[in-house]
Amino acid sequence: MNTQPFTNSKGVISGNCWRIGVLSDSLLRLEWSDTGEFNDDTTLMAVNRDFGTPPEYSTSIADGLLTVETTALRLTYDMRPFSKEGLSIVVKGVKDTKTNTWHFGDAQEGNMKGTARTLDWADGAIPLNDGVVSRDGWSVLDDSNTCLFADNGDIKPRKNAGIDLYFFGHGHRYADAVADFCRLSGRSPLLPRYALGNWWSRFHRYTSEEYVALMDRFKSEGIPFTTSVIDMDWHLVDDVDPKYGSGWTGYTWNRKLIPDPQRFLGDLHERGCHVSLNVHPRDGIRAFEDCYPSAAKTMGISPDSGEPVEFDLTDPRFVRAYFDMHHDLEADGVDFWWIDWQQGGVTRQPGLDPLWVLNHMHYCDSARDGRWPLILS
């Protein structure tokens, strides 16, 4: 991953416990640290803080107040712990004086929202997180509690508590706000061409013969498909001994339905379809799985013990066992994975969302050996 975590030094104004970064004429980074230690690592959100030569701006101090001014913004700050009374920013391009000034802590009432973490349990309208465009002319992204990337790509927690905000003061230049966000967070990767075609997915217990016959029927009717998404019944579900728990998580082919997985996937490839399998990783790797002996050895567990390999993406040994297992299935012909996580947002590392890290690790893994990366989540 190409990252530029350091803000150009010419765009940084700082004191003992505060730091302001001028990334663009409308985008500022605002930091407070009681210890005076600031974060210059890449976060899970911010991967590029160097936008090149900073825009022209001026600074001045009068009556104990710092003023930082760009062509688009005017910041006023009392150089003390951030407060509503001591930190404010005027967005020059917004004529409405009721909304053109942000004070630290203000609610984002005009925010036009961004994305949702997941559509699980959605039935109609759902709450969305704040985005970077707003009818008020400004928005704030709080990056204070986001985990960090280490130099080797591992994910680590922040060392020090503090405040780390990004102020988007683009007025009603919404496209410019999104463009600055893309520069900060990294450009969206290009999808492989086949992903833009028709996909087939149905929660139905297909046999391999039924599925291939369905693809042939689609072709005969002139309905083209480029992607076959196969739901959870590709693996053992009802045949799992209750002592292991449910069959929700599984990695062993159900050979009652799909007796020859390699042939089945090969048949789909011959028909021009890329194949994705559904996975629910929450229950880890249990003793009934074909891959259990290998995974147990990787974890230092005796395969004879039957002890489950618990799901824990903060453990490098589990990560290795987990992806070795997926690589073996890919050798059968699986092209990419449908990451179907529905079990909450907690890992053993504070601030690290299991769905986020699953998506990140699977996406990076899918890019190995020069492949064009893709996941469904």
Regions found by a protein language model. Name each.
Residues M1-T7:
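Short, Gly/Pro- and small/polar-rich lid/capping loops
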Residues L23-D63:
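A low-complexity, Ser/Thr/Gly/Pro-enriched, surface-exposed linker/loop concept
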Residues D41, R80, L87-I89, D142-D143, ...:
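Short, solvent-exposed loop/turn and secondary-structure capping segments
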Residues T59-A195, R202-F203, S208, A213-S220:
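Catalytic and substrate-binding clefts that recognize carbohydrates or anionic sugar/phosphate headgroups
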Residues P189-V346:
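Aromatic-lined carbohydrate-binding/catalytic grooves of carbohydrate-active enzymes
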Residues H327, G351-I375:
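Catalytic-core region of carbohydrate-active enzymes that cleave or remodel glycosidic bonds
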